[in-house]
């Protein structure tokens, strides 16, 4: 590409302060340095995690910032020493990097590379950024920042994918789908013929249902107070749909009545800390497994769970990004989609452009949208 080695001026959505609308700005994207990759972004999903953090003061010291992390694009150029991708490759952004060398990368039971530390700084280039706007250094959300026409990332945060992959579809595999599907396949290890319940029917919750179905679950109960989501849940594999508000008794008692003694596997995907106890209580007392999927409402929240729920054999565990070793396994998920092993198309309900990013945010907040994709 004729842009190699040059600063690229392009458009991006910039968050100047928490709670403010995203601003469409011209930014400058410098060439990649050693072990870095510059990417022409093509599509990005708008994730619930982006929405949650837009209005929180947690990001105030990192503004200006480019939000977004669920993205795909084409490699424009690479820095010295990059070997896993080259110019022209289709790539997917990795919400958790995989260096392949640290203690956790070498542990088969762990998917949290120590280089995830970069996400806390929101800087993709070891203490700095290759992106500026109006003379200011621009941070990149969790060291990615996909709401931009171009970005620069570390090689360990990028993976090559199938050259035939439809980027406007597979972008959501990078976070939302991988998180939910993997929670069922890897974290819970759902078994054939089992019973499952899924609390929360957003994009991640529906992806859990797809995972439960793929694992051979016999009964999958979708739980949400938004009945508009029930048809979509049935489309992707739910056998039953329940609104807790339709009953006078607690949801755990409702599910225990539906499935004698409780379900084998329950997934809490609402992010509501108060729902964790109900999800655990919905599991069979002797062998039920409850998985909290993704981030709860706040990292400082305290769980209040009745101790008797642990008296027998129930298990409560967490799951982050579905337990996938990202650089190795996220591309395989893209290939599995191409091979029609599962269908993510029903999860994408809206497709907009970068200039419509604020409309996408409002759609997600309103509950009218499962997953919105921005074309860049």
Curated annotation (Swiss-Prot):
Entry's InterPro entries?
ADH-like_C (IPR013149), ADH-like_N (IPR013154), ADH_Zn_CS (IPR002328), GroES-like_sf (IPR011032), NAD(P)-bd_dom_sf (IPR036291), PKS_ER (IPR020843)
* One of the GO biological process terms: retinoic acid metabolic process
Quote the SUPFAM superfamilies the UniProt record gives: GroES-like, NAD(P)-binding Rossmann-fold domains
Q: SMART domains from the entry?
A: PKS_ER
Its chief place of residence is cytoplasm
Query: What Gene Ontology terms describe what this protein does at the molecular function level?
Result: alcohol dehydrogenase (NAD+) activity; all-trans-retinol dehydrogenase (NAD+) activity; zinc ion binding
The cofactor note reads:
Binds 2 Zn(2+) ions per subunit.
Q: What does the record give as EC number? A: 1.1.1.1
In terms of Pfam families, this protein maps to: ADH_N, ADH_zinc_N
User: Where does the chain bind NAD(+)?
Assistant: 200-205, 224, 229, 293-295, 371
Catalysed reactions, semicolon-separated: a primary alcohol + NAD(+) = an aldehyde + NADH + H(+); a secondary alcohol + NAD(+) = a ketone + NADH + H(+)
GO cellular component, alphabetical, reads: cytosol
Subcellular location per the Swiss-Prot or TrEMBL entry:
Cytoplasm
Q: Which cofactor does it need?
A: Zn(2+)
Entry binding sites for Zn(2+) 2: 99, 102, 105, 113
Query: What's in the keyword line of the UniProt record?
Result: Cytoplasm, Metal-binding, NAD, Oxidoreductase, Zinc
Kindly list the positions annotated as binding Zn(2+) 1: 47, 69, 175
Q: What does this protein do?
A: Alcohol dehydrogenase. Catalyzes the NAD-dependent oxidation of primary alcohols to the corresponding aldehydes. Oxidizes secondary alcohols to the corresponding ketones.
PANTHER family per the UniProt record, alphabetical: ALCOHOL DEHYDROGENASE (PTHR43880), ALCOHOL DEHYDROGENASE 6 (PTHR43880:SF20)
Subunit info here reads:
Dimer.
Q: To which protein family does this belong?
A: Belongs to the zinc-containing alcohol dehydrogenase family. Class-V subfamily.
Q: What is the protein's given name? A: Alcohol dehydrogenase 6
From which organism does this entry originate?
Rattus norvegicus (Rat)
Q: What is the lineage of its organism?
A: Eukaryota, Metazoa, Chordata, Craniata, Vertebrata
Point out the gene that encodes the protein.
Adh6
């Amino acid at each position: 590409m004729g842009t190699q080695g040059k600063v690229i001026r392009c458009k991006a959505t910039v968050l100047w302060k928490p709670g403010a609308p995203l601003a469409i700005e011209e930014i400058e994207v410098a060439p990649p340095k050693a072990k870095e990759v510059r990417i022409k972004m093509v599509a990005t999903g708008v994730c619930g995690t982006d929405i949650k953090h837009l209005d929180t003061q947690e990001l105030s010291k990192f503004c200006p910032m480019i939000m977004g992390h669920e993205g795909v694009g084409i490699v424009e150029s690479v820095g010295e020493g990059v070997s896993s991708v080259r110019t022209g490759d289709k790539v997917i952004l990795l919400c958790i990097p995989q260096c392949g060398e640290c203690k956790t990368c070498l542990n088969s039971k762990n998917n949290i590379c120590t280089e995830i530390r970069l996400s806390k700084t929101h800087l993709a280039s070891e203490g700095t950024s290759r992106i500026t706007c109006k003379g200011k250094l621009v941070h990149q959300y969790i060291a990615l920042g996909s709401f931009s026409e171009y970005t620069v990332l570390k090689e360990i945060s990028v993976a090559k994918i199938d050259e035939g992959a439809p980027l406007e579809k597979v972008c959501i595999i990078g976070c939302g789908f991988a998180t939910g599907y993997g929670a069922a396949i890897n974290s819970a290890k759902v078994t054939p013929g089992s019973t499952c319940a899924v609390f929360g029917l957003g994009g991640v919750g529906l992806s859990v249902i797809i995972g439960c179905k793929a694992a051979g679950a016999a009964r999958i109960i979708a739980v949400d107070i938004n009945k508009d989501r029930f048809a979509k849940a049935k489309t992707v594999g739910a056998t039953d749909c329940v609104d807790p508000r339709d009953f006078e008794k607690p949801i755990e008692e409702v599910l225990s009545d539906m499935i004698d003694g409780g379900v084998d596997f329950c997934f809490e995907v609402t992010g509501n800390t108060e729902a964790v106890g109900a999800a655990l209580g919905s599991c069979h007392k002797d062998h039920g497994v409850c998985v909290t999927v993704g981030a709860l409402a706040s990292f400082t929240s305290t769980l209040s769970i009745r101790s008797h729920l642990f008296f027998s054999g129930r298990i409560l565990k967490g799951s982050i990004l579905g337990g996938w070793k990202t650089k190795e396994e996220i591309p395989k998920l893209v290939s599995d989609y191409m091979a029609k092993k599962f269908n993510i198309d029903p999860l994408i309900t809206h497709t907009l452009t970068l200039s419509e990013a604020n409309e996408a945010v409002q759609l997600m907040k309103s509950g009218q949208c499962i997953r919105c994709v921005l074309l860049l």
